[in-house]
Design a protein with these regions (language model features):
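Membrane-helix boundary connector in multi-pass membrane proteins
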Residues: 86-103, 121-122
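Hydrophobic alpha-helical membrane segments
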Residues: 74-88
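Structural signal for membrane-spanning alpha-helices in multi-pass inner-membrane proteins
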Residues: 20-23, 60-64, 88-91, 116-120
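Membrane-helix boundary elements
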Residues: 4-8, 13-43
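Non-cytosolic membrane-interface motifs at loop->transmembrane helix junctions
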Residues: 35-43, 97-108
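Hydrophobic cores of alpha-helical transmembrane segments in multi-pass inner/ER membrane proteins
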Residues: 51-60, 109-120
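Membrane-water interface at the C-terminal end of transmembrane alpha helices
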Residues: 111-131, 135
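Core segments of alpha-helical transmembrane spans in multipass integral membrane proteins
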Residues: 14, 18-22, 42-64, 79-83
């Protein structure tokens, strides 16, 4: 279980780093399905927030490398990713659907955190509960 969780976190860190760097250096036109040429303010904000996305990826990588010592951060990683999916859903409800390639991204942003938390719960919380009950 621990190695599965570790590899999921490494994969998440890699995808996040690639997409973060892509937007940081490519701006709005680097987003899949973009028609290019975004307003300067939108491009500016996207590049700014891409740095936080990169930091999230680095954090996922750090937790994966030190998973036994840093397991307590796993629920936060899952929660942030899930809330990102909620952000996409709010956008769809507010301004309409994005490019079709981003719909699977939103679905993954709901599914992956649930899987991460499920593995976390089974590996860490369940064991802690067993130990405190003396079984």
């Amino acid at each position: 279980m621990e190695s599965t969780l570790k590899y999921i976190l490494y994969a998440l860190a890699l995808v996040v780093a690639i997409t973060g760097l892509n937007v940081l250096f490519g701006g709005a036109s680097a987003i899949p399905g973009s028609t290019g040429g975004a307003e300067a303010t939108v491009d500016n904000e996207l590049r700014f927030f891409s740095v936080f996305w990169l930091a999230y990826g680095a954090f996922c990588f750090w937790v994966a490398q030190n998973i036994q010592a840093q397991y307590k951060f796993i629920p936060s990683i899952a929660l942030v990713f899930f809330i990102g999916g909620l952000g996409r859903l709010i956008s769809i409800l507010s301004v309409g659907p994005p490019a079709s390639v981003l719909i699977p991204a939103m679905i993954l942003e709901f599914v992956i955190p649930i899987a991460i938390y499920g593995i976390y719960w089974k590996k860490y919380i369940k064991n802690i509960t067993k130990q405190s009950c003396g079984t």
